[in-house]
Every structure is written in structure tokens, then in C-alpha cells.
Regions:
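Mobile, glycine- and charge-enriched loop segments
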Residues: 102-127
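Flexible glycine/acidic-rich beta-alpha junction loops that bind and position SAM and/or redox cofactors
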Residues: 32-33, 81, 87-92, 122-131, ...
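Short, hinge-like loop/turn segments at secondary-structure boundaries
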Residues: 39-41, 68-70, 135-136, 164-168
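Catalytic cores of alpha/beta
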Residues: 62-67, 125-143
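Radical SAM [4Fe-4S] cluster-binding motif and immediate context
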Residues: 1-110
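Short beta-strand segments at enzyme active-site cores
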Residues: 20-25, 116-119, 148-149
Length: 180
């Protein structure tokens, strides 16, 4: 959507008194310039809390500075870590380096003006249960408000779904298409 269309929708949301908005964009900060523009739109209504998913490995210095200046309570962030295993991230074709993701998570968790949660995804290729438990323990050291463990969903049209047989992943053919 264009920034103008988003602004119009944001205004309608505000007019209706809605206080929590979940932005369904799994790559909110894939384009840091656009992310900054969106944050400036959100800043205009500090009485609304915007819930975003952010990729901590892709935080530019400029976006970090922008996040630090936002009003307290404007954002609730989910930091998409997915796994702390390089082989899992590589097999899943996750962009960004793990070291950058952890540095980004550390930065986000240090911000006192927003709540940050860390997300892990069970069911990723090569990701074993014992490793998930180890990763949860490791993430507790970062100070995230919550550590969320979600199951992998193979949505139609996604690369992971196209590669399911190759990766040995079985999933439900019915929504929400979770790994079995």
C-alpha cells in the first residue's frame, strides 16, 4: 500500500477509537527507509499501540535512532529470531547474519520506550526439540518481555511450501497449514 493509503486507514482507525493495531507485514524493516516513514505516520497518534514484526538483523543505525525517539507505548515489537542455529537459518534461507540478529535483539530489548518479544519457530528444517529448549534458555539472557514459540506454517505460494518435500517437512493441507 502507498503511504497515503496507509495514512487514510490509520486516520479511520483513530476516528473509531481503536487503541491496538497489528501490522501484518513480516518484513516491516526490510526497507529501512519505508519503515522510518511508517514510524513517522504512527508517531502522529501516540494513543494507538502498533504491533509490528521486525527483523533484528536488518536494523540500520538510522532506524535504531528513530526507534529510540518514539513515544513510550507506541510500539510493541516481535523480533523474528526464528532459531539460534546457523544451519537451521541457512536451510530456511533466512536473510541476515545470526550475530546481527542477536545484536539487534539486544538493542531492541534495551529500549525502555517499547515492549520487545523474541520469536522462535518450531518445525524449521534441521531444528530439533533439544535445540529449541537451549535457544529459549539463551534468549532469556536478552531481556525480551516474552519469548514466543510458534509452529511453522507452510502457507500456499511460499518458498518453504514449495520445498517441503525436499526438506522432508510434512504439514497439514488445511489452514493454518502447520507442520505436523
Amino acid at each position: 500500500l502507498s503511504l497515503e493509503a496507509i495514512k487514510e486507514r490509520r486516520d479511520v482507525i483513530h476516528e473509531h477509537g481503536i487503541k491496538n493495531v497489528r501490522v501484518l507485514d513480516r518484513t516491516f524493516n526490510y526497507n529501512n527507509k519505508r519503515a522510518k516513514e511508517l514510524l513517522n505516520l504512527f508517531r502522529e497518534y501516540p494513543d494507538i499501540c502498533f504491533h509490528l514484526e521486525i527483523h533484528p538483523a536488518l536494523l540500520s543505525d538510522e532506524l535504531k535512532q528513530e526507534l529510540a525517539t518514539l513515544p513510550k507505548g507506541l510500539l510493541h515489537l516481535e523480533a523474528g529470531i526464528q532459531s539460534l542455529r546457523e544451519n537451521v537459518l541457512e536451510q530456511s534461507r533466512r536473510i541476515g547474519k545470526l550475530s546481527n540478529a542477536l545484536a539487534g535483539l539486544h538493542y531492541l530489548c534495551s529500549l525502555e520506550n517499547m515492549e520487545t518479544h523474541a520469536d522462535l519457530i518450531a518445525g524449521l528444517p534441521l531444528y530439533h526439540l533439544s535445540e529449541i529448549f537451549d535457544d529459549v534458555r539463551t534468549l532469556t539472557e536478552y531481556g525480551a518481555g516474552e519469548i514466543q514459540l510458534e509452529s511453522l506454517k507452510l502457507l500456499p505460494g511460499t518458498e518453504m511450501r514449495r520445498r517441503a518435500d525436499e526438506l522432508g517437512i510434512q504439514y497439514s493441507p488445511l489452514p493454518p497449514y502447520e507442520v505436523l
